[in-house]
């Protein structure tokens, strides 16, 4: 049975810069957007806000849905990655709460698009989607019978 990993990611933008998180994987420092897996007891928007806080210490809510990417990683792991936009008025300090995150950096779009240390090609693709102006209302992602507590009828 096909069971893709459901993940969320945040393109965080302030004052012309984008926020990336840096983590060391197999001895290499890699950049990613604040991102992670959906948990069973949360909506996609809640997951995005949680991952942002865990990985950067920033408490903010996504303002827009950008895109859903269906992707097969090089190790053949399937993903459905839901991408959200978060616009901040100004660059703010970061304090990761997730021990897997080494640091956070505010960088330009060009630095991301030209970087050789991206965790996946989706990091650059997410910036391209953001730059293209793709934005959809959060209501596009509906919660049905949420929270799910009554069982199947």
Swiss-Prot record:
Keywords: Hydrolase, Magnesium. Monomer. It comes from Escherichia coli O1:K1 / APEC. This is Phosphatase NudJ. The keyword Magnesium applies. InterPro entries: Nudix_hydrolase (IPR020476), NUDIX_hydrolase-like_dom_sf (IPR015797), NUDIX_hydrolase_CS (IPR020084), NUDIX_hydrolase_dom (IPR000086), NudJ (IPR033713). GO terms for molecular function: nucleoside diphosphate phosphatase activity; ribonucleoside triphosphate phosphatase activity; thiamine diphosphate phosphatase activity. Its EC number is 3.6.1.-. Residues 3-131 form the Nudix hydrolase domain.
């Amino acid at each position: 049975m096909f069971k893709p990993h459901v993940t969320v990611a945040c393109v965080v933008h302030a004052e012309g810069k984008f926020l990336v998180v840096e983590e060391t994987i197999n001895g290499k420092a890699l950049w990613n957007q604040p991102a992670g897996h959906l948990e069973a007891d949360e909506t996609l928007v809640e997951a995005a806000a949680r991952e942002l806080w865990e990985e950067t210490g920033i408490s903010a809510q996504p303002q827009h849905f950008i895109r859903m990417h269906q992707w097969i990683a090089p190790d053949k792991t399937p993903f459905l990655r839901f991408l959200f936009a978060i616009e901040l008025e100004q660059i703010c300090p970061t304090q990761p709460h997730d021990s897997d995150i080494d640091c956070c950096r505010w960088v330009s779009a060009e630095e991301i698009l030209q970087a050789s240390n991206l965790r996946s090609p989706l990091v650059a693709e997410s910036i391209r989607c953001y730059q293209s102006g793709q934005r959809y209302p959060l209501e596009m992602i509906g919660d049905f019978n949420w929270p799910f507590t009554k069982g199947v009828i």
